[in-house]
Swiss-Prot record:
Keywords: ATP-binding, Ligase, Metal-binding, Nucleotide-binding, Queuosine biosynthesis, Zinc. InterPro entries: QueC, Rossmann-like_a/b/a_fold. The gene is queC. The lineage of its organism: Bacteria, Pseudomonadati, Pseudomonadota, Gammaproteobacteria, Enterobacterales. Gene3D superfamilies: HUPs. This is 7-cyano-7-deazaguanine synthase.
Amino acid sequence: MKRAVVVFSGGQDSTTCLVQALQQYDEVHCVTFDYGQRHRAEIDVARELALKLGARAHKVLDVTLLNELAVSSLTRDSIPVPDYEPEADGIPNTFVPGRNILFLTLAAIYAYQVKAEAVITGVCETDFSGYPDCRDEFVKALNHAVSLGMAKDIRFETPLMWIDKAETWALADYYGKLDLVRNETLTCYNGFKGDGCGHCAACNLRANGLNHYLADKPTVMAAMKQKTGLR
């Protein structure tokens, strides 16, 4: 039996990964992390979606220690989430240092427990938000270290790594879940479901991708299929 663990926030990217994983694996587990995030409404959204989509199990792990160590606008109410700035340089204040290091490591431990061969994460390098822990180089390096440390070949899969947001919408549509992802996921840094607040970087990236996809579905769908190998 093929098993996978999805790092699941209830947002657009991880929900799209879950939708695909449910088609590719016999048994899919979800793991969600409570780190005292500003947008912790995503935890309830993740619970609802994991149940609705048919995950075998959904575990919510308390990692609030991360909140004490990592200073970010997503972990401190005193630091405002900035509006989207197209020319912004450097690492944004929404970056939570160590978050994906911790999430992927704990997800791998959980995968070891449930005998899953893969950990799936929705990180993306094509139009990422300036986060160093979304890079392919980082994921591969951590995957190697974790596999060595556990003496087990647990594979980190990144199905969105080389597709952009428009193509991520196309992937959801390919599996017949465009409306679900559009209306029932929570991507917004300010914690608003669906289209979100419309001002933060996460909402802007999501909206621009959707508009691009809806404006030229055939072209974007074809590009997504070419990059992912889907037919």
